Amino acid sequence: MKETYAEYFIYSFDDVSITASSGAGTVGTYENTSLRFDSDSQFAAQAWTFVSTDPQINVRFQETGHGRYMFDRAKQIRTVAGRPVAGSSVGLTAVESLFSPMPFLAPYIVEPATEMIMEAADVSGSTNALRMAWHGSKLRHGPAPWNKP
């Protein structure tokens, strides 16, 4: 059995601009943004956090390596990625940026060098900005550096 260890790591979609929908409650055009995972290890995603100018955003994720989607259809980001505890603006100060993450029931394993496509659409009727973090661990083979003789 190969020895493995996990290192905490965060991948993120940063400063994603989402075009306004035609009106509140109307789903806008889905826009794709990609996130490339490193080629040095698998990644075990364990929780999501996000901050946006308005949390009325629909999202869906597709893993390009397998072509599989994480959901059967687009979901409101608030229902799958937790939510900011104090406010929801991208311009939060350090004191205000307290997040309530959305932990996964089981880690979601992403293969090395995978590209994840986030499809996002505004539902608020206003131009939206989004940042989203994937919290988890890089799964590495071999002895942990802190356990080496």
Regions found by a protein language model. Give the residues of each.
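Beta-strand-centric surfaces of beta-sandwich/beta-rich domains
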Residues: 1-149
